[in-house]
């Protein structure tokens, strides 16, 4: 019975101490291998009770159904507002909370000074509401009440008339609001995009959250924000499984940034049509994160050449054969010709030469269902069965 790819990977992992995490990078145009490996990844995560997050960077963001069957999970589109990834985003009482908000705002072009003005704006809101006796949790809808200078002035006048603050305090608070109001107006426009990720409920183990980042290919800031929110959520809840689907096209630096920032204990796998079309820096991030790599047929010869270099060289000893025939008459009697004693065969072994382990032409012509497994420093060609 032939060895399956899972058995081969398991045998390689057992020989290493400590065994590397079972995190897979699949690169290539063979959709059959993507479906087989993707199905095993999802089934394994579901059996262990892990919520699944699919970052779908395919054209239109519809690759989840094409590359891997979602069996058992209840699939939820993150854009519907049913899932909360950053309920605590507006909680800026700690350095961690401030850093999380600053990271998200940076994706929308907020520099450090403007981001800190947003933090001051949120704290201004909390302080004013506390003085008014309102203890309800901070929400985007409530924060919008402070988007107008007229409303803020009215609220502060209420506090002054009720004796909760002095006239000097009212003037001071109005001055503080004037300092941060410009950043507050920009923040309100960002809140419109963040609203679907703040409301809703926390993902449970039976939920598969679909991130259609490929549908926002023309909106880089939106892609970066979605990946930043996911990375922030997974940092706080590392017991999860992340599956990245990528069609190998376009600029994908936001994916490598997310991979770099995810916790080491979080299970992450990636199925891409071409990991070697990334920049060298981005490709190194992927290769360092995924200890187990599977390479199938690649369509671009430039990528095949890079994969050829990645797989390394092997020593090849080439042999040459020569035959010397004695043409002299006395050496060509009937017995000499019959017994072959009129010729001399020579076999020469040349010095070892370094040749590619897998040539680029071979990689580009790999048949369906066949892939190169790179794990534990060894490389093998195996077939993939469902």
Label every PLM stretch briefly.
Residues 57, 270-278:
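Conserved H-loop
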Residues 60-61, 275, 301:
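Alpha-helix N-cap/helix-start and coil->helix boundary motif
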Residues 1-266, 281-282, 361-366, 372-385:
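P-loop NTPase motor domains
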């Amino acid at each position: 019975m032939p060895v399956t790819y899972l058995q081969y990977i398991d045998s390689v992992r057992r020989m290493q101490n400590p065994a590397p995490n079972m995190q897979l990078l699949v690169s290539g145009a063979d959709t059959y291998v993507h479906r087989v490996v993707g199905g095993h990844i999802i089934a394994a995560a579901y059996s262990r009770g892990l919520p699944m997050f699919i970052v779908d960077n395919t054209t239109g963001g519809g690759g989840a159904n094409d590359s891997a069957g979602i069996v058992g999970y209840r699939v939820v589109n993150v854009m519907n507002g049913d899932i909360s990834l950053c309920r605590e985003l507006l909680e800026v009482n700690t350095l961690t909370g401030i850093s999380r908000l600053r990271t998200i705002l940076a994706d929308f072009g907020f520099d450090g000074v403007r981001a800190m003005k947003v933090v001051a704006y949120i704290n201004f809101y909390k302080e004013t509401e506390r003085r008014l006796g309102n203890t309800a949790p901070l929400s985007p809808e409530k924060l919008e009440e402070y988007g107008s200078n007229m409303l803020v002035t009215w609220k502060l006048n209420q506090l002054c008339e009720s004796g909760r603050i002095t006239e000097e305090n009212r003037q001071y608070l109005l001055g503080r609001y004037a300092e941060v109001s410009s950043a507050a107006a920009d923040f309100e426009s960002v809140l419109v995009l963040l609203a679907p990720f703040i409301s809703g409920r926390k993902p449970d183990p039976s939920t598969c959250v679909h991130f259609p980042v490929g549908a926002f290919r023309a909106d880089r800031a939106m892609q970066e924000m979605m990946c930043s929110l996911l990375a922030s959520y997974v940092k706080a809840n590392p017991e999860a499984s992340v599956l990245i689907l990528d069609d190998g096209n376009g600029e994908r630096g936001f994916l490598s940034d997310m991979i770099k920032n995810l916790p080491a204990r979080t299970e992450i796998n990636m199925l891409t049509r071409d990991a070697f079309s990334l920049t060298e820096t981005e490709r190194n991030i992927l290769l360092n994160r995924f200890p187990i790599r599977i390479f199938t047929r690649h369509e671009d010869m430039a990528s095949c050449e890079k994969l050829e270099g990645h797989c390394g060289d092997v020593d090849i000893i080439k042999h040459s054969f020569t035959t010397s025939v004695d043409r002299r008459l006395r050496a060509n009697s009937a017995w000499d010709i019959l017994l072959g004693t009129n010729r001399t065969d020579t076999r020469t072994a040349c010095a070892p030469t370094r040749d590619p382990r897998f040539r680029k032409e071979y990689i580009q012509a790999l048949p369906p269902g066949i892939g190169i497994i790179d794990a534990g420093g060894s490389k093998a060609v195996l077939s993939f069965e469902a």
